[in-house]
Amino acid sequence: MATGPRYKVPMRRRREVRTDYHQRLRLLKSGKPRLVARKSNKHVTAQLVTTGPDGDETVASAHSSDLDAYGWAAPTGNLPAAYLTGLLAGQRAVDAGVEEAVLDIGLNTATPGSKVFAIQEGAIDAGLDVPHNDSVLADWSRTRGEHIAEYAESLDEPLYSGDFDATALPAHFDETREAIMED
């Protein structure tokens, strides 16, 4: 570690590799609420956050574990679950009076077709106005989980056994999406 009078210690969240302050400042200058999309291996989270002088305030949020209330029985860390989480967060934001937002992907890499863009697509379908480029959104077949169902069909039965039959994922996705849209 560098020493001396000219050495400047980075901010704590920068040292922990949790915040890109240059990106955060650009998002805050827009003056719009942020659609914060975060992912882990098992879950995804979507939040609508406004910034004020007293700090950030969460207006609406959804976690992929919230999908259980709408009948989602599949794993919660995949692309279809990310879309449904964005759809749910978008509906909650519209109910709270938010009309537009900008996407905040944090330190996630902006890979086209990824889960953070599936969250964005779900929020757009819920009625939020989020500026985007259609080339980063996944094909609808991938968003529905057809690629997961095809892979599950190619596996041998002893290798593939679980609580949820992934070959029925696209139909299950459609049912859950309708349940969220009706709510």
From Swiss-Prot:
Gene3D superfamilies (UniProt xref): 3.30.420.100
Classification via CDD domains: Ribosomal_L18_L5e
UniProt keyword Chloroplast present: no
SUPFAM superfamilies assigned: Translational machinery components
Any GO MF annotation of the entry: structural constituent of ribosome
Record key words, sorted: Ribonucleoprotein, Ribosomal protein, RNA-binding, rRNA-binding
GO CC terms: cytosolic large ribosomal subunit
Superkingdom as given in the UniProt entry: Archaea
GO biological process: ribosomal large subunit assembly; translation
Family: Belongs to the universal ribosomal protein uL18 family.
Subunit structure: Part of the 50S ribosomal subunit. Contacts the 5S and 23S rRNAs.
Name of this protein: Large ribosomal subunit protein uL18
Source organism per UniProt: Halobacterium salinarum (strain ATCC 700922 / JCM 11081 / NRC-1)
Lineage: Archaea, Methanobacteriati, Methanobacteriota, Stenosarchaea group, Halobacteria
